[in-house]
Amino acid sequence: MKKVCLIIGAGAGIGGSVGAKFAANGYHAALCRRSDAEGLQKLVDGIESNGGTASGHMLNAVEEGAIEKLVEEVEQIGPIEVVLFNLGAQIGNRSLESTALKTFELGWQMACKGLFRLAKAVIPAMEARGKGTILVTSATAAVRGNAGQHSHAAAMGGRRMLCQTLNAEYASKGVHVAHIIVDGAVDAPDTLGKMLGAEMFEKLRETRGKEHDGLLLPTEMAETYFHIAHQHRSAWTHELDLRAHSDLAWWNHAP
């Protein structure tokens, strides 16, 4: 049985690129997303055309029992050695008045509760095997709250603290949890492209991306994710931030 890299939130950006990287290095990539079955199949086909193995799984991570059922199914393919929790929880800038309770709760369900449920599902087997890695994509909002980010900042801050508590309990048992702060815009059509719209996204790519290297490239980010998952336990990375060379770090931005 092949070792498995399970990706929760596999789009044509970070998730898909990480899946391709792991599949190219001997893992079966189990790719999961909520919608766009056709896009998911394209990711699977791309991996297989390059000699890797992959499977696509439609997943509504907010639905009770869905994550737990998925983990059981994927463990039948092979041992889940690496998990990437790549669900976003960005709802855009909204004032407190315009942030409904349901909207606030949805951000928490995706960013924090989803990770909790995933950890509960995968860690027992990882602990029993004495090894396993949980990679968690996060955002600047995890370390800095801004106006209009009531749902997102609270959810991502919770995600960060959950990563710390998981490490405190399970690092000594061989389970490595890494909180990866994406501190910048990612050149990803499935996320930033949809938020901005096709025309604005392409304009941004022309001015900051491409040869300018001012947008985070998912394929290059995947190299970092892969490296973290294969670190020696004497020098594990538990948290880091990724940004393009031309971006100011989050702590240097004026309030």
Language-model-detected regions and their locations in the chain:
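Conserved glycine-rich cofactor-binding loop
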Residues: 11-13
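Conserved glycine-rich Rossmann-like NAD(P)H-binding loop of the short-chain dehydrogenase/reductase
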Residues: 27-41
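Rossmann-fold cofactor-recognition segment
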Residues: 49-64
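Conserved mid-core segment of classical short-chain dehydrogenase/reductases
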Residues: 68, 88-105, 148-151
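Catalytic loop of short-chain dehydrogenase/reductase
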Residues: 89, 133-158, 164, 168-171, ...
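Catalytic Tyr-X3-Lys loop
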Residues: 97-116, 131, 135, 159
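Amphipathic alpha-helical dimer-interface segment in Rossmann-like NAD(P)H-dependent oxidoreductases
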Residues: 110-128, 168
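C-terminal helical subdomain
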Residues: 172-175, 179-184, 195-255
